[in-house]
Design a protein with these regions (language model features):
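Core AdoMet radical
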Residues: 1-52, 63-79
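Auxiliary Fe-S-binding modules of radical SAM enzymes
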Residues: 32, 50, 56-131
C-alpha cells in the first residue's frame, strides 16, 4: 500500500477501481486480493470474457457493479451469451448492478456464432436490454 496517498484511508469518494478477469482461474486469483484492499468503490469487469465464470463468491454489497464484455479483434475468442446471462443472474442475486458493455467480435447465442464488427459491439450489447 506504499503507492497510495497518505490520506487514502478506505479510498476516495470520487475514485472507483475495477478489477478485470477473463476466466475462472484469474477470477479466483485476483478477486480475493481485490476484495481485501481498502477501496471504497469497487467494480468487477469480466472482459474479455473467454469462458464461463462464477462470480457468486465475490459479488456482494462491496461491489458497485458487475460488467461483462466479449473480446474484440480479428482473432477474438468467442463469448457465449449464456455466460453473460449467468453473470447477470449472479449480480441480480447479490443485488449488484449489472452492465453488458460489449458483445465482442464473436458472440455465440443459441448455438449460432455471430461475427459482429467492432463499430456495432457496444450498440448490440445495449440492444440486448439486459442491464
Amino acid at each position: 500500500m506504499e503507492c497510495v496517498p497518505d490520506d487514502w484511508g478506505d479510498g476516495y469518494d470520487n475514485v472507483l477501481v475495477g478489477c478485470t478477469v477473463e476466466n475462472q482461474q484469474m477470477a479466483d486469483y485476483r478477486l480475493p486480493i481485490f476484495k481485501s484492499l481498502p477501496i471504497k468503490h469497487k467494480s468487477i469487469i469480466v472482459a474479455p470474457m473467454i469462458e464461463a465464470v462464477d462470480l457468486s463468491a465475490y459479488v456482494d454489497r462491496s461491489i458497485e457493479e458487475g460488467s461483462v464484455g466479449g473480446e474484440s479483434g480479428q482473432d477474438a475468442r468467442p463469448c457465449d451469451y449464456a455466460w453473460i446471462l449467468a453473470i447477470r443472474e449472479q449480480c441480480i442475486k447479490a443485488d449488484v448492478p449489472f452492465h453488458f458493455h460489449q458483445t465482442g467480435a464473436r458472440l455465440i447465442k443459441d448455438g449460432k456464432t455471430y461475427h459482429i464488427p467492432r463499430c456495432h459491439q457496444h450498440s448490440q450489447a445495449r440492444k440486448a436490454n439486459i442491464n
